[in-house]
Each structure stands twice: as structure tokens, then as C-alpha cells.
């Protein structure tokens, strides 16, 4: 018979997603009986004279005195869960036997050298937790990023109804490919702390290895799979981080450096790497929870600075709009929303998603990729490569020899290319327009610098009062020197453009020659 607690236990069916179900303790959770948020009371049990129930398990039912530091750390761990789920924790005072969650402070002898145990909802001794101060180096919870803090968040996950991804606790399925509790990260490497704090492989284990002794560099929040699971049970905290928030990438390996999963309920938000002293990777895509679609991205995409044992992933359904890179060589990736992506100094690669993005490379030789959407791509100083892809994009090369590139990977289609504006084409700076033969399939020009004379023509006249579109020319690339329009004339002298058409306008209407192009195989 389960221990009596303030709240009743309810149960939800499994979701059908093994990466959520694998960390659900059979779907059991503490029910609020319709009130919102779910209010869960807790008590620090620190009196050896308290008459706590002796009937649950083989572990100590007396507790050592909790220190203020230990209490504060556990409260921070509770707050980490309350930040993401529709839960409100209430401290009802020390030594309250009836509290839903009762927290023991024990030692190695009392806990057989185990770091922590928490009985999940619906089990004998439900809500009773044991934290081993000795096994955790003298502090029961420690600082964020330490193994002690990981244990605190992990055990509180059990307290709320979560299970391990490596075993069948509560009837949960094991994560695909996981063969043991330690060291086995399973298919796609998803059994590790960067994706779920319920794993026994803390931190970014597959990249950084075992860092349990550092005192930093592990996860400090529930991670993407944990957040999805706990929100399935209790609902979302839609009041957390509703303003315009900035998340700064950790830039130093020190106490407090950690990985965290961003749960943000609103506002226009930014991941900022400007303080980093090395290359950064920033990816604004959220954890999809779908391995078939996104592989390991189901558990989130890691944003971090090179050599630093900390960073961010983004929880499912969270929108982070903007990214700011460092002054080194960064990789910045946008999402499906309207992003403002800034590279700053360094030779950066910046790629937008499906939204209408503004992408600014800053100083350095950058590669800017717009993808779907009507994007604004700004090279800044340096020799940049600018790729718009689909959408009607605006290209601003800035100072330096820039390449405005067109290569969709397939034959030219207007929807794939759009009608772009090249704002500042400057031959004297070495600017070029690069055309791929895999896209501009009618070109006869050999790969290399310059179009063949037969492939390029300049139009200066009107036909029947409309701009000459190249319908009467054999050239495949036709430039209208009156208005800066640049056409792909796939059909040559035949009527119409075939699948081609206007693909760019050089708004400064420069002089253009066949030598201003590069042909790519």
C-alpha cells in the first residue's frame, strides 16, 4: 500500500513516443484534482527524533540535519522543474511527515553508497527521497553543472513521475539501442544528459566524456525529453520567461558552467555568443521529439562555444528568434520563424530557415545562406559568398570581393530561386555572380571564370513598349542594362523563357559583362 500523501496519484496513458514514454513512470503523477497549477508540498526531514514511517524499503528513516546550503540547492532544483511545468512547490516546514515530498539527508552507510533515491508516485514510500551528502562530496545538491546538482534534479524527476531511459522502471520502455545504465547512449546517442537528465550519462557525454569530478560542465535543468514528459503529466508553465530574454553562451569553464534546455514562453529572444573566446555554434531549432524526421535533433540542437563544457538546447515548441555570434569563426543556424542572425567578426557560416530573415555576416569572409523566405543578407567587410535560395531576397555584399551564388541543386524553377535584388554589385571590388550548371542547365559555358560569349547578352531596347526580356536572343543569360534586370533565358530564341525568367535585379544598374560570372559545375 502506498504511503498516504497530501495529493492523490493519477495515471495517464503512454504517448506512443518511446523517447517520452521511456522516462515516464507508467504515466503516474500527482493529481491536483482540477486545480491549476498542481500544488505539491515538501518538507526537509532533518530530525533524528521524528517518528517517520519505518515500513518503506530498507533505507534509513532518520535524517541528518539539513544545512542552509543544502536546502537552498534543493530549492533551486525544485525551481528548475517548476519553471517548465504547471507545478507550484510549497515548503510546509521541516519534519512534516504528511508532506507529499519528504527529503532525507543521509550518508553512505545509510544509502549503501548510492547517490540518491526517490520513490515515484504510486509506489510504496511514494514521495520519500534520500539524498546522500557523503557520496556527493559533502553538499547534498551542489551548484548548477555539478554532479550533485544533476542528482538533485534527477531524483526530483523520479519524485514527480519520471523513470530511467535505461530500464523498465514503472513499466517504461528502454530507449532504443541502450544496453546498460552507464556508457551506453543508444541509437542516435540520445541516452545522455544533454537530452534527458534521467540518464546515467550526465552532460554532453558523447562529446566530452565522463566529467563527473569537475564540479561543472554537466546539465543544470530538465532537458528536452524531460520537459516534454513532465509537461505531458502536469502541463506547461506558460508564465515563465514571457519577456524579451537573452541567453548568453557560457564562455569560461568554471563553477556554474553547465548545459541547460531553454524553456521560454514568449517574447523576442536571443542566444548571444559575443563573450566567447572561441568559435561558437548557435542553432535556433527546437527539439522536435521526432527521430524519424530529425535524428538526434529530436532531443535538441546544442549551442555552445568550442572547448566550453556548457551551452543550450531549446525545448520543443519554444521559439528563439535571434542569434549573435562571437568574433571568431561561427556557425549560426536559424529556424522557421523570422530571425535576425549576426555573425560579428570572423569567417562565419550563417544559414536562415523558412522565415523572412535578416542575416548579417559582419567582418570576415562569410558564407550567408537564406533558404526559404524573403531574406535580407548583408555580407559586411570581407570576401563573402551569399546564397538566397527560394524567396525574393535582398543581397548587400559590402566591402570586399563577394560572390552572389545561385545553386539550388536541381534544374531552375522560379519557386526555388525567387527574384532577388543585388544592391551593390561592384566589379572593381571583384564581385561575381556564380551560376551552377546543375541549376542553369541550358548553359553551354564550361565551368570556370566567365560565361561563354554565346551564353551572355545585354539588352538595351524595348519591344512593343515592354522591357526586352530576351525572347528574341539566343543567349541564356540576358542583362537589361536599362534597369538592372537579369534573366535566365532557357529557351534561347524560342518564345518565352521556358522554366527560366527574371531571377535577379542589380539595383545599382552596373555595367555587366560575361567576365563578371563564375560557372560552377
Where are these regions (language model features)?
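Active-site recognition of the HExxH zinc-binding catalytic motif
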Residues: 150-165
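Active-site scaffold of zinc-dependent metalloenzymes
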Residues: 44-47, 118-144, 319
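Low-complexity acidic/polar repeat-biased segments
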Residues: 221, 305-309, 317, 321, ...
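Acidic glycine-/aspartate-rich tracts in secreted/extracellular proteins
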Residues: 47-49, 97, 107-110, 136-137, ...
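Acidic, glycine-rich calcium-binding repeat modules characteristic of RTX/beta-roll
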Residues: 62, 138-142, 146-147, 170-184, ...
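Catalytic zinc-binding patch centered on the HExxH motif and its immediate surroundings
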Residues: 35, 105-128, 181-184
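Zn2+-dependent metallopeptidase catalytic core
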Residues: 53-95, 266, 272-277
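Disordered inhibitory propeptide/activation segment of secreted metzincin zinc metalloprotease zymogens
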Residues: 1-66
Amino acid at each position: 500500500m502506498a504511503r498516504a500523501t497530501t495529493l492523490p496519484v493519477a495515471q495517464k496513458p503512454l504517448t506512443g513516443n518511446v523517447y517520452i514514454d521511456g522516462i515516464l513512470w507508467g504515466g503516474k503523477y500527482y493529481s491536483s484534482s482540477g486545480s491549476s497549477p498542481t500544488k505539491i508540498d515538501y518538507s526537509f526531514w532533518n530530525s533524528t527524533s521524528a517518528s517517520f514511517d519505518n515500513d518503506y524499503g530498507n533505507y534509513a528513516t532518520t535524517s541528518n540535519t539539513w544545512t542552509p546550503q543544502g536546502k537552498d540547492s534543493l530549492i533551486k532544483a525544485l525551481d528548475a522543474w517548476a519553471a517548465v511545468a504547471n507545478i507550484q512547490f510549497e515548503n510546509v516546514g521541516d519534519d512534516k511527515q504528511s508532506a507529499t515530498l519528504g527529503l532525507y539527508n543521509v550518508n553512505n552507510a545509510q544509502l549503501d553508497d548510492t547517490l540518491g533515491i526517490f520513490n515515484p508516485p504510486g509506489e510504496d514510500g511514494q514521495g520519500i527521497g534520500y539524498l546522500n551528502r557523503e557520496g556527493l562530496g559533502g553538499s547534498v545538491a551542489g551548484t548548477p553543472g555539478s554532479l550533485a546538482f544533476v542528482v538533485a534534479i534527477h531524483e526530483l524527476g523520479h519524485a514527480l513521475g519520471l523513470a530511467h531511459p535505461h530500464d523498465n522502471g514503472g513499466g517504461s520502455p528502454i530507449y532504443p539501442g541502450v544496453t546498460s545504465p552507464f556508457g551506453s547512449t543508444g541509437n542516435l546517442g540520445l541516452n545522455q544528459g544533454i537530452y534527458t537528465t534521467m540518464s546515467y550519462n550526465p552532460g554532453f557525454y558523447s562529446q566530452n566524456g565522463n566529467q563527473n569530478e569537475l564540479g561543472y560542465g554537466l546539465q543544470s535543468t530538465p532537458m528536452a525529453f524531460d520537459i516534454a514528459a513532465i509537461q505531458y503529466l502536469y502541463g506547461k508553465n506558460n508564465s515563465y520567461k514571457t519577456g524579451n530574454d537573452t541567453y548568453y553562451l557560457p564562455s569560461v569553464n568554471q563553477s556554474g558552467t553547465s548545459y541547460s534546455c531553454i524553456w521560454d514562453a514568449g517574447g523576442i529572444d536571443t542566444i548571444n555568443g559575443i563573450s566567447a573566446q572561441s568559435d561558437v555554434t548557435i542553432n535556433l531549432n527546437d527539439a522536435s521529439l521526432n527521430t524519424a524526421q530529425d535524428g538526434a535533433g529530436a532531443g535538441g540542437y546544442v549551442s555552445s562555444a568550442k572547448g566550453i563544457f556548457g551551452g543550450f538546447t531549446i525545448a520543443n515548441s519554444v521559439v528563439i528568434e535571434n542569434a549573435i555570434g562571437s568574433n571568431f569563426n561561427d556557425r549560426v543556424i536559424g529556424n522557421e520563424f523570422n530571425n535576425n542572425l549576426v555573425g560579428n567578426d570572423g569567417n562565419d557560416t550563417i544559414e536562415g530557415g523558412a522565415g523572412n530573415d535578416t542575416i548579417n555576416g559582419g567582418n570576415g569572409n562569410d558564407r550567408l545562406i537564406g533558404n526559404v523566405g524573403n531574406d535580407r543578407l548583408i555580407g559586411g567587410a570581407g570576401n563573402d559568398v551569399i546564397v538566397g535560395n527560394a524567396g525574393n531576397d535582398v543581397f548587400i555584399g559590402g566591402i570586399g570581393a563577394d560572390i552572389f551564388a545561385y545553386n539550388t541543386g536541381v534544374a531552375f524553377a522560379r519557386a526555388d530561386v525567387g527574384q532577388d535584388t543585388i544592391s551593390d554589385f561592384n566589379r572593381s571590388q571583384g564581385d561575381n555572380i556564380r551560376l551552377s550548371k546543375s541549376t542553369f542547365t541550358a548553359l553551354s559555358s564550361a565551368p570556370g571564370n566567365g560565361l561563354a560569349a554565346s551564353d551572355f547578352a545585354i539588352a538595351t531596347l524595348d519591344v512593343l513598349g515592354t522591357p526586352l526580356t530576351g525572347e528574341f536572343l539566343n543567349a541564356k543569360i540576358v542583362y537589361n542594362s536599362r534597369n538592372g534586370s537579369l534573366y535566365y533565358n532557357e529557351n534561347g530564341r524560342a518564345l518565352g523563357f521556358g522554366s527560366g525568367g527574371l531571377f535577379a535585379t542589380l539595383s545599382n544598374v552596373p555595367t555587366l559583362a560575361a567576365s563578371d560570372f563564375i560557372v560552377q559545375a
